[in-house]
Amino acid sequence: MEQTLVIQKKKRFGFSQGIGITLLIAIVAKYLAELPFLNIMGQLVIAILIGMVWRAAIGVPHDAIAGTNFASKKLLRFGIILLGMRLNLVDIAKAGPKVLVIAAVVITFTLFVVYGLTKVFKVEKKLGILTACGTAICGAAAVVAIAPQVKAKDDETAVGAAIIAILGTIFTLIYTLLYPVLGFSPYGYGVFSGATLHEIAHVIAAAAPGGSTAVDIAVIVKLTRVTMLVPVAILIGVWFGKSEGSKEKRSWRDLPIPWFIFGFLAMSAVHSLGIIPEVVAGYIVVLAYMLIAMAMAGLGLNVEFKTFRKLGSKAFVAGLIGSVCLSVLGYVLVYALGFM
């Protein structure tokens, strides 16, 4: 009996230790994300990279794994639900139908192109789907939201999120350098940035040279893409379930429904209706990013650099080519739809 109590106490301590490590990493990532250049990467990206470095340099105690796994799965879902508070559907509606059109075209095009490229490069199917969704919708948040739909492993999820983060940072720097020669008005440049970059942090950083006009519309366009996360997650779950059905004999009733995504949508509706004051909504968004950063840290703590090299090289190339295609499409759409 006494031995059982000791074991249980040890497990509880290990669980708390795992949660504590992810929280520490998330806090450090938040402050690092406020520094020059690192603010381009954002808190989520930095958290997953710190997690990978922590594992390589220090290691993770065996008893702490339960806590890091809890953060990477349970806290992740809660964080995504709260992240819905970032959306204001009224602002998106005011932006007009053209914004919805450009978001729908960009997402559809990118999903097919990037996933097609991952097949050409023989990337593992689940990682290919995650790379495509992260590029098309909202970066690392999309990767971790779609992962349960395709039953992705932690290392696949972490590698997918890291790939998207690195690509987004590269393209953010390129956009900033090219802004003077692209020929866009600040408004058009904001639409272009919001329609083609990966993370919200990337969008804000890239649009900054265009001033507040560019940043404001860039965020609205980006958040319009984020709203597509709900239908895309459901469609991916249905499609993946059917594609695997012949092997697993799964029925439509067995398909995973991402209930936390509906929570995300519900929170965005609450924000849009003005039920919660903007100040409170802002704090909720900060909490959401903190929880998702803890999840990213948990994922990073479960991945070794050799795993990233093994799984990520071909997926990175596919994502790179796909991102170039996305940028070209975005450039064409800005001109075609009159966002000058």
Swiss-Prot record:
It is found in: Cell membrane. The chain crosses the membrane at residues 13-35, 40-59, 99-118, 128-150, 157-179, 189-211, 218-240, 255-277, 279-301, 316-338. The keyword Protein biosynthesis does not apply. Pfam families: Cons_hypoth698. The keyword Acyltransferase does not apply. It comes from the Bacteria. It is a multi-pass membrane protein. Coiled coil: none annotated. GO terms for cellular component: plasma membrane. Keywords: Cell membrane, Membrane, Transmembrane, Transmembrane helix. Belongs to the UPF0324 family. This is UPF0324 membrane protein BA_5405/GBAA_5405/BAS5024. It comes from Bacillus anthracis. The lineage of its organism: Bacteria, Bacillati, Bacillota, Bacilli, Bacillales.
